[in-house]
C-alpha cells in the first residue's frame, strides 16, 4: 500500500491555489430568434451599441443596426449558413474598422480590409474606423489645386480641383467607369493615392479594371475595394465607407488622394434591401428616410485640408446610374444636391460616336474653376459657349434650307470642336497636349481642315510637338501657363502640321 505523505498533499494544494485564476470574463451574449435574408433577430445583447460588430457561433460577423424593445436586428456580413435559431451571438464591443497602411497600395481588399487577390496578408500596424466624422470648417481650405483627369473636355470645361466632389452620372454603358479609370491612369507621377471602390459589380468587371490598371502601371498607387454583386448587402453598403477610410488615412498624412465610388446607386439599393428587411418604414421609391444622410456623410468626408492639418486632400468622384436619362429620380437628385458639380453622360451622344459622351450643356463644376490651370483657362473660356451655340444652331439648321455664310462657318467650327474633343479610352492627355488641341479649335486655325481629318490632325499635332517641339511641352507642363513664346511655337506647329496635311490631301 502506497503511503500518503501530508507534505506532498499540502504542496499540491498550495500549487493549485497559487495557479487559481480568479478573473471573471464578462461577455454580452444573446440568442438568435430568427434568421433569414441576411438579417438576424437576436434576443439579449442588452448592452450592445448601434453599429457594433457582433460575432455569431459559426464565426460570421454582423452589425447591430436595429435596437428594439425586445430584440436586436443585425445584418450579416457573410453567408451565415451555420447560424440556426437558438445559436449564441456575442457582442464584440468594437465598431467596424479597417486596417490601413502603405502596404495596401496595389492590393484588392474586401470592405473589411481583408485581401482577396491571393497575394497574402497585408501587414498593418494601425486601423481606422470605417465611419468617421468629416473634417470641420476650420480644418478645411477652399479648393485651389487642379486634379487633371487627362480628358480634354473635362479639364477644359468642367475642371475638377483637389478636395472636390464631382458626380459622374449617366445611363448604363455610357462610359462612366471609363472616365474614372482614365482619371486614375492620369495620376501617374502626380503623387496621388487612388482608391477605387467597386459596389455590386460583376466580379469579371472588377478583374478587368485591375488588369487595365496593372497594364498602365497605375496599380502601384491604387487600392481597390471590391464588394461584388454576389456579396452580402451589408458588405455592399459598407464598401464606400471603407474606401473613404483608406483614403482618409493618406489624406491626414498630407497626401493628395482620389476616391471613386462605382457606383452609389448599388449602395443605395443594398441599403434599401437591408432597411426593408429590418422593417424600417419605407419612403420615396421604397428607400428609407435616411438614405440622403447615408450619402451626405460619405461625400462630406472629401475635403482639402488646411495647412495646419497637413494640407492633404481627398477628391471624390461618385458615380450614379440613371434609368433612361432620368436625373430627377430620388437618388440622382440627392447626390446632385450633395456634390460640387456633375458630369452628365448621354447615351444619345455615346451612340452617335462622341466619346467620352459628355453633355457639356448640363454638366457643371461649381468649385473647380478656382483650381483650373491658367494655361487652359485662358483659351477654353469660350469653348463651352461655342459648343452650346453649335448645338442650338445644329437643331435649327435641320429645318432651314439655305444658311448664310456666317452660320455655316459657325456650324463647321462647332463640328470640328466636337471632333477635337473625341478621345480614345485609357489614353489620357497631358496639359500641354490639351492646350494645343483646344487652342487650334477655338482660334479657328483648323477651319480649313476637312471634318473627317480633324482626329488625324489632332494626333499628328501631338506627335509633332513631342518630337520636334519638346520645348513647348516642357514650358507648358512646368509653368502651367501659355506665355507668348509658347504660343508662338504652338501657332507655328499648328500651321506646319495643317499645311503638310492639306498638301498631301
From Swiss-Prot:
It is a peripheral membrane protein. One of its GO terms (cellular component) is plasma membrane-derived thylakoid membrane. It comes from the Bacteria. Its main location: membrane. Gene3D superfamilies: 2.40.30.20, ATP synthase alpha/beta chain, C-terminal domain (1.20.150.20), P-loop containing nucleotide triphosphate hydrolases (3.40.50.300). Its EC number is 7.1.2.2. One of its GO terms (molecular function) is proton-transporting ATP synthase activity, rotational mechanism. SUPFAM superfamilies: C-terminal domain of alpha and beta subunits of F1 ATP synthase, N-terminal domain of alpha and beta subunits of F1 ATP synthase, P-loop containing nucleoside triphosphate hydrolases. InterPro entries: ATP_synth_asu-like_sf (IPR023366), ATP_synth_asu_C (IPR000793), ATP_synth_asu_C_sf (IPR038376), ATP_synth_F1_a_nt-bd_dom (IPR033732), ATP_synth_F1_asu (IPR005294), ATPase_a/bsu_AS (IPR020003), ATPase_F1/V1/A1_a/bsu_N (IPR004100), ATPase_F1/V1/A1_a/bsu_N_sf (IPR036121). It is found in: Cellular thylakoid membrane. It catalyses: ATP + H2O + 4 H(+)(in) = ADP + phosphate + 5 H(+)(out). The record marks 363 as: Required for activity. ATP binds at residues 170-177. It is an enzyme of class 7 (translocase). Keywords: ATP synthesis, ATP-binding, CF(1), Hydrogen ion transport, Ion transport, Membrane, Nucleotide-binding, Thylakoid, Translocase, Transport. It holds the Pfam family ATP-synt_ab. Belongs to the ATPase alpha/beta chains family. HAMAP family: ATP_synth_alpha_bact (MF_01346). Produces ATP from ADP in the presence of a proton gradient across the membrane. The alpha chain is a regulatory subunit. F-type ATPases have 2 components, CF(1) - the catalytic core - and CF(0) - the membrane proton channel. CF(1) has five subunits: alpha(3), beta(3), gamma(1), delta(1), epsilon(1). CF(0) has four main subunits: a(1), b(1), b'(1) and c(9-12). This is ATP synthase subunit alpha. The lineage of its organism: Bacteria, Bacillati, Cyanobacteriota, Cyanophyceae, Synechococcales.
